[in-house]
Structures are given as structure tokens and as C-alpha cells.
């Protein structure tokens, strides 16, 4: 049964960092975190939010890290994209075990594991109330999953990109290291690019700017944050024109 609530963002693209799925572990997927996120998503779906999800792969393999150690960059990025498929399948499993109908769609065809990404089919899944998890990034090397998240948000005409991380917004420096880090409540795309803030890569910010797609950065581990985001309540950092 769906609740009638004053939803500001009817269709959302949720970008989950792979590192956040580790929880307090040093590698891989923390099942407790996975189940928590599934519960938060289930609440969004019950509200009537149409949700697309892009998951990173930093908990398993990061292409840039492989390239920095001498690997061919395209090969390393391909490995990273495959790692996102693993995370996407884990997320799909957690959601379906919680009763949320979910479809994983991969930008790299692998029909025996999940659907191939087709924009019109993805949109139809969303219209039917299914959560769609977009795996394998953009399907091309040299693009981060942050850029993939913004790209998919534009393609499905999402109202907002919500980047869920381990911190409660955007700071002028890493709050995990610096106690005097200052949090921003609101930023413009140009602020992010000019200040070199580590929100997401410049390509993703530029893509959002071109389409005037708002980005919200919030702490994934705080219960109710994603619900607040959908309702338009102030949480985390909002990035707009």
C-alpha cells in the first residue's frame, strides 16, 4: 500500500558509493549495510517514489587505482565496471528479499545475469513501480560511476540526483581527517568546479549543470535521510545552478 505524501522529487536517481557498502569492513559488502539501504529504499517506494540506483565499485575494485599501479587504464576501468555488477546483484537481492520488485540492467550485455540497459525499458520499469539498478557504469572506460549516475538521471528524466556517502554533505576539506572542516548547505555547480570540491568528477558536475539537474549529497547511514530528500526537506548539501 502506498502512502500519499507531498513528494517533491517523484523520480530520483540514487548514487551509492561502493565504499559506503563496506560499512566498517575493509573490503567487500557488509550485509548489515546492504539490508539497511534496502530498508531505506523500500520506504521510498512505499511513498510512491520512482527510483533508479547506480552503485559504485570502490569496495571491490577501483579502475583508477589499478591504472596507478601500471595496469592499462581501459582494462582497469572494465574491471571496475564488472565490480559494479557484483554490487548491483547484491543490492537487487537485498531489495527483493525485503519485498521490493527490482530490475538490474547492465550497460555491458550479460543476458544470463541481468537485463541489458535500454532506456525506454528502464523508464517503463520505473513507471510500474520497480526499482531499477543501473550496473556497469556507462559501459565505457574513462568514465566514473558518478558520471554514469548523472547520465542515467538525465536519460530517465529523474528530478534529482542523490549521492549517498559516508559523510553528511560537502565540506571544504575531508571531515574524516580535518576537525575544522566546514560544511556547505548549498553550492552552485560553478562553486564545485571552481573550488575543486571532491563531490564527484568534473564531467558529472558539468553534465548536471548543462541540464540544470540538482544534486543532493547526504549521509546514507542516517535513517530517514533519503525520505527527507524525497520530501524536499533540508538534508546534506544541495547543488544547483
From Swiss-Prot:
Gene3D superfamilies: Acetylglutamate kinase-like. One of its GO terms (biological process) is UDP biosynthetic process. Pathway: Pyrimidine metabolism; CTP biosynthesis via de novo pathway; UDP from UMP (UMPK route): step 1/1. Keywords: ATP-binding, Cytoplasm, Kinase, Nucleotide-binding, Pyrimidine biosynthesis, Transferase. It catalyses: UMP + ATP = UDP + ADP. Signal peptide: none annotated. Inhibited by UTP. GO terms for cellular component: cytosol. ATP binds at residues 15-18, 58, 62, 165, 171, 174. UMP binds at residues 77, 138-145. The keyword Transferase applies. It is an enzyme of class 2 (transferase). The keyword Transport does not apply. It is found in: Cytoplasm. HAMAP family: PyrH_B. Homohexamer. Catalyzes the reversible phosphorylation of UMP to UDP. Belongs to the UMP kinase family. This is Uridylate kinase. It comes from Desulfotalea psychrophila (strain LSv54 / DSM 12343).
Amino acid at each position: 500500500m502506498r502512502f500519499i505524501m507531498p513528494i517533491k522529487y517523484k523520480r530520483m536517481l540514487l548514487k551509492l558509493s561502493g565504499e559506503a557498502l563496506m560499512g566498517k569492513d575493509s573490503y567487500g559488502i557488509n550485509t548489515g549495510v546492504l539490508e539497511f539501504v534496502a530498508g531505506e529504499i523500500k520506504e521510498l517506494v512505499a511513498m510512491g517514489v520512482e527510483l533508479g540506483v547506480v552503485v559504485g565499485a570502490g569496495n571491490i575494485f577501483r579502475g583508477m587505482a589499478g591504472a596507478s599501479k601500471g595496469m592499462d587504464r581501459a582494462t582497469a576501468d572494465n574491471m571496475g565496471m564488472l565490480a559494479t555488477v557484483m554490487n548491483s546483484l547484491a543490492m537487487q537481492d537485498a531489495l527483493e528479499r525485503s519485498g521490493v520488485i527490482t530490475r538490474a540492467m547492465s550497460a555491458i550485455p550479460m543476458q544470463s545475469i541481468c537485463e541489458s540497459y535500454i532506456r525506454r525499458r528502464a523508464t517503463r520499469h520505473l513507471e510500474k513501480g520497480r526499482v531499477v539498478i543501473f550496473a556497469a557504469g556507462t559501459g565505457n572506460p574513462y568514465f566514473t560511476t558518478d558520471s554514469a549516475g548523472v547520465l542515467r538521471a538525465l536519460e530517465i528524466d529523474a528530478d534529482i540526483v542523490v549521492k549517498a556517502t559516508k559523510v553528511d554533505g560537502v565540506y571544504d576539506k575531508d571531515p574524516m581527517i580535518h576537525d575544522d572542516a566546514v560544511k556547505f548547505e548549498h553550492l552552485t555547480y560553478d562553486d564545485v568546479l571552481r573550488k575543486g570540491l571532491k563531490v564527484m568528477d568534473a564531467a558529472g558536475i558539468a553534465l548536471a549543470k548543462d541540464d540544470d539537474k540538482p544534486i543532493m549529497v547526504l549521509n546514507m547511514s542516517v535513517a530517514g535521510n533519503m525520505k527527507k530528500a524525497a520530501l524536499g526537506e533540508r538534508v546534506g548539501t544541495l547543488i544547483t545552478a
